[in-house]
Amino acid sequence: MDELKNLEFEPEITEKFEEGFNFRTVLAALFIGFIMLPGSIYLGLITGGGLGGAAQWVTVILLVEIAKRSFVQLKKQEIYIVYILASSLVSAGLIIGTGFLVLQGGAFSDLIWKQYLVQSPYAESFGLTPHIPRWAVPPPNSEAILKRTFFHKDWLIPIILVIVHNVLYRINMFSFGYALFRITSDYEKLPFPMAPVASEGATSLAEVSAKKETWRWRVFSISAMIGIIFGAFYVVIPTITGLLMTNPLQLFPIPWVDFTTQIENILPSGLFGFATDLGAILTGFVLPFWVVVGTFISSFLCQTIGNPILHKIGIIKNWQPGMTAIPANVVNTMDFWINVTIASGIVVGLIGLFKTITSFKRKFERIERKIPEGRGDYPIPIALLIWFLSTVVYIIICHILVPKFPILLFAFFGFFLTPFLSYTSARMFGITGVASGVAFPYVREATFILSGYKGAEIWFAPIPYFNHGYLAQSFKQLELTRTKFTSWYKAEFTALGIMLFCSFLFWSIIWRMAPIPSSTYPFAQKMWPMSAIFNALWATSTLEGGAKWMIEAIKLKSILYSTIVIYLIYGFILITKIPVAFFYGLVGGIVTLPHYAFPMFIGALLGRFYMAKKIGPNWQKYRPIILAGYACGFGLIGMVSVAVALIAKTIFQIIY
């Protein structure tokens, strides 16, 4: 059956497009940069969560409340621009290591990560340290590293590269993302089923701005109080005691309680524990039930039960008694699970690509619909030309930084993989609302290794390999809120300037207060080493005579067998008509630690079998607001503790 047969293009609403960027949104951006960003950085280092959606909610709520008391009614265009500004400023960050950790805090989070990597014992033990290029980070014996400061000449080139990359990336993403939107929305007329979610949220907040109190605010307020109370124990106590003690007091172990060493006599190499953040349970409320069930089953069977079996038959060889969750997960991954991860990525990616290709069988009306007046459009060829030129600049920069790497491979990333991946992703957003199954697993790493290049510089270069598919849905949301596209351009580049300055300022202050990671930042101290190990393993795989652990860990036979098994599971799920979401949960659970899968599963069970019956049909509406309210309250109390810590440590440094 054609999956698209019921997807018909609906005529757009006829409201006039309006400007969403003005002085009020600039003030909101400044508030986010100077108030929310440092809180996000500090909380990310302590708990690993950052502010996330809380930054968006807090900023919008504050703006709405100020406007109400000033007898000003905010337009939905202004509210939506502020909403995406908060996401851009606070959530922007770096995916480090294996991709499981996101380091929030703007552009300079990249340099903070690299200063840790260059002086980490893992980079040194693998022989990577002398090969890390100076244009990426100063050497570990530099005063810039020893004194923990960005105000040093050794940081000049890395900082310039960070700024150039952030400007160039936005030019690249806006131009190609706009072209994707025009193709998928105006020509192919895809429905983008998830786009109305954000647009309706902005509309609801605009109604609140008009002093219309709704049930949303009651639910949100109660949830926020829960977040404040829990955050007082989870964040405030460790933060405040960290000012007075070498090791902060933690009423709840951050980020989890780990039972790995306790169960090793029964389940050697098995992992088990549970995350102590209440947000993990609330996340189980919101995520699709079958996704959570699949994630928990897969995580428990693979990481808790499967590892001991693999250890007993000699596949997992490097596990040693006494290993906690992090080192045990590293050796288990290297011995076996990295091959299953690659296989699962291949399967999910091919499924997404197959759905995209088969969707072409639908006979779209290839006549472009009339472009709404005042939307902020410009010709597609101009957009593609801007994207082409920005990609060329990326290739030139990469060739200058890594002249020995084949320039044709830079072009392969920029002019083939990026467009293909982005277009496939954009179509998946247009058809299903999500594109989590569209990816080319480890193609970047495989290209580096198989290219014959010898050196480590390529692993630190700004390769023009991006997925801009989500931009098509973002432009669709702008259209639904009747916001001029130019509002987003102006807001994003204004936010970029604020983000660069605030990221530089607050990372400088926080890094100066204590080494990152250290006992002051418990989440970073526990989780960053795992990512550093994987980074070092990948980077040394292309060194002349360097470490070959990563290459040796990847076994084509294991990948092939795993791919076949995963495809058989997918086929069984289709035949038995089990929800396909269960399959994607199974795939995601392979690499999910039980520490997170277990509390999410508890949350999913509570939500489906208790809360849904207790509250009734409205539970479906309450779920996302409960999580957002909790995140807001948690973020607010976290920001208060962060403010106290920053002031106290700054005064302490001034005195002494």
Residue ranges and their predicted role:
Residues M1-Y656:
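Alpha-helical multipass membrane-protein architecture
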